[in-house]
C-alpha cells in the first residue's frame, strides 16, 4: 500500500497551504460533533476524535475552543453529512464528502463544479464501490512487525502494516480504527501524524498532462467549497 500512502501524504500536503480553509472546515466538524452529543470530548468519542485530527492538522486551540463554545451556547445550525460521486477524464473517479447546514445549496454547488470543471456527477454508489473505506494510522517508527504483533494481541482487524519514509503506516478495517489507536496508546505510543478514515481506491489511473490539468482543477474547486470536507480520487499522478 506504499503508493496509496504516498497519495494520502500528497493530498494532505497540498491542502496545508490553505490554512484558513482547513481551520474553518475543522471548526464546522467540531461544532457538529459537539452538537450531536456532549460538548465534552471526554464524554463524546466522536468529538474527541475530531479534535485529535484537528491537532494533527495544527489547528490552533482557539479555533477548537470557539467551535465547542458555540455548541455549548446553543447554536441553532444543524449540519448534515453527504457524499457526492463523479467522474473526470479518462477513467478518473472522485468522491466528495460534505458537511452542510444547507443541503440544497451544497447539491447545487457540487453539481455546478462538476459541470464547469470537466467532470460528470454520478449517482450514489457509481464510484464508491471502487474504493475501500479504511482506517489509516501513521506515526514515527521503523518496526512494522512489532507494531503488527501489538495490534494482533489487541485483536485489531489489520489490513496491512508498512514502514514508509521513517513512518509506520497502519491500514485497518474502518470499524477498528479507534480500537487500533487505543491499543497503540496502551503500548506507549502517544503521538500520531494521521488517524483518519480514508476512502482508498482499489486501483489507480495515470492521466496525461492535459487531462491531469483538468482533473486537478476539478479537485481544487471541490476542496475550495466551504461545504466539502474531504475529496478522494483514484489518480496516481496527482
UniProtKB/Swiss-Prot annotation:
Keywords carried by this UniProt record: Cytoplasm, DNA-binding, Transcription, Transcription regulation
GO biological process: regulation of DNA-templated transcription
GO cellular component terms attached to this protein's record: cytosol
The organism's place on the tree of life at top rank: Bacteria
Keyword Repeat attributed: no
InterPro entries: Integrase-like_N (IPR017856), TACO1_YebC-like_2nd/3rd_dom (IPR048300), TACO1_YebC_N (IPR049083), Transcrip_reg_TACO1-like (IPR002876), Transcrip_reg_TACO1-like_dom3 (IPR026564), Transcrip_reg_TACO1_YeeN (IPR026562), YebC-like (IPR029072)
Localization per Swiss-Prot or TrEMBL: Cytoplasm
UniProt keyword Transcription present: yes
One Gene Ontology MF term: DNA binding
Location, primary (coarse class): cytoplasm
Family annotation (Pfam families): TACO1_YebC_N, Transcrip_reg
Family matches, as HAMAP family: Transcrip_reg_TACO1, Transcrip_reg_TACO1_YeeN
Family according to the record: Belongs to the TACO1 family. YeeN subfamily.
Protein name in the entry: Probable transcriptional regulatory protein YeeN
Gene source species: Escherichia coli O157:H7
Gene: yeeN
